[in-house]
Design a protein with these regions (language model features):
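Alpha-helical propensity feature that highlights long, continuous alpha-helices across diverse contexts
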Residues: 1-67
Length: 67
């Protein structure tokens, strides 16, 4: 099955995560090492981007198991 590019979807997942946090009144969220995570996807470290990438990869794997 051909899925959309992981980077493109990861950026969208990150946008949705930020929107969800903002809707809850959260304006800042930091990683375990103190990196601000509520910034544009392109501004994240590779380690922080991996959080979103891993989410997308897990969803893709789950879909593959269903088809």
């Amino acid at each position: 099955m051909n899925f959309p590019d992981i980077e493109v979807v990861s950026a969208k997942v990150h946008e949705a995560w930020i929107a969800s946090k903002l809707a809850q009144g959260v304006i800042s969220r930091k990683s375990e090492v103190g990196e601000e995570l509520m910034v544009e996807y392109d501004l994240l470290s590779e380690a922080a981007k991996d959080l979103d990438r891993n989410t997308v990869k897990a969803v893709y794997a789950a879909i593959n198991q269903l088809v």
